[in-house]
């Protein structure tokens, strides 16, 4: 088991306002599998990623348990957040690669479909799609036991998105645990790469299961993802 949340509740208390963003969340991310979080804006998906990667804000108060085994790689929702703005993407990727012997920059870029001709560009001079792919490459270079990707294909055309999903699936098949946050159920259905879907609503896990299992659910919060 690469990671598990046990009855995790997260309250954000800034002193001016307080909000419960996660309530009694139970979640398992298994080795060798792709687990996908589905939900609307504000339903708590990114907060789950923050909990698993140690990125919860200082104002967060938690109860429950967060259990993580091994190294965790993270692909942020906005890929440019994975990079400093004052150095080229290539320089930063090479720095990451220098501490790890498993992945080379060339291999990581190929897996993420990041074009080699963009390596010399500053992050902000990449297109939205390019910098998102670069962020995937950066995460792979850390050789994580668990990869967490927050909307990794949101800025990509369909062909490139398929390629990134294929890379994610291959990484899981090599033994890693993968957690992906996405809104693109059509692409998810087309690839068939998800082993488990976890649907969230208002900070809670509604249900979890395979794509086929959830398609037959009677819960309206689940059915809406499979209608139309």
Language-model region placement:
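Conserved ABC ATPase signature
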Residues: 122-126, 130
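Conserved catalytic motifs of ABC-family nucleotide-binding domains
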Residues: 143
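Q-loop/switch helix immediately C-terminal to the Walker
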Residues: 78, 85-101
């Amino acid at each position: 088991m690469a990671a598990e949340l046990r009855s995790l509740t997260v309250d954000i208390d800034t002193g001016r306002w307080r909000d419960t963003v996660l309530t009694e969340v139970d979640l398992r991310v298994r080795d060798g599998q792709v687990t996908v979080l589905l939900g609307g804006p504000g339903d708590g998906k990114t907060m789950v990623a923050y909990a698993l990667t140690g990125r919860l804000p200082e104002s967060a108060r938690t109860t429950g348990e967060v259990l993580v085994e091994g190294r965790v790689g993270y692909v942020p929702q906005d890929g440019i957040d994975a990079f400093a703005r004052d150095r080229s993407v290539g320089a930063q990727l090479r720095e990451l690669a220098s501490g790890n012997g498993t992945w080379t920059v060339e291999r990581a870029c190929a897996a993420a479909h990041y074009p080699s001709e963009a390596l010399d560009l500053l992050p902000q001079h990449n297109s939205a799609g390019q910098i998102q792919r670069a962020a995937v490459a950066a995460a792979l270079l850390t050789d994580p036991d668990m990869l967490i990707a927050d909307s990794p294909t949101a800025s990509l055309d369909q062909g490139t998105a398929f390629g990134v999903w294929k890379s994610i699936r291959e990484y899981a098949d090599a033994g890693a645990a993968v957690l992906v946050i996405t809104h693109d159920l059509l692409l998810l259905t087309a690839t068939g790469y998800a082993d488990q879907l976890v649907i969230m609503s208002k900070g809670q896990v509604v249900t979890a299961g395979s794509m086929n299992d959830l398609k037959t659910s009677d819960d309206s919060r689940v059915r809406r993802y499979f209608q139309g």
